[in-house]
């Protein structure tokens, strides 16, 4: 996939802000202990999670980056945010090549027994290989109450989503203009065995493809709290669409 690197990703910035607002609203007073992410060179997701109090300086970071050339800048960005070498493990590999055993070793190195927050921010499609990876990580590495966030391409390789096209009862997913939002939400609910709450379809200006972001799981199921989070989420629907 070819991201347009000459343009600022203003829509993604709004989506990232809304994502961590939602996680904060549905997990009040909780600071996550171990954050699995794909922060790239700017670590925007780590910065926003820290700003909103979803994580703090005691949180352990497991960062994944497949491009060896980006590692130096990634580590510098994490260090500037307060996550030095003793607070992080950086894994350089393709996402689906990383086994649960490798992630458990990273947890052990950091002094935690599991991962309780994931942001699988990919530029990939939700093909079966990625589905299996998510299933494996949730089953073997994540804590029982973990929050799993996934950001995937919504309109390229869709053959492995065909069986999920039956309409499901997903919060706000019917308001997404991208027709693959509901199947993706359905698929991720099955992969994670967690309710899909936050579902947003968006698209950056330029050549970038449409994306769908989903959050699975939350600690609070109180109707009033969810209603507030849903109202906030509505404001992020269809960003970047005409």
Give short role names for the model-derived ranges.
Residues 52-56, 137-143:
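Short, conserved loop/helix-junction motifs that constitute active-site signature segments
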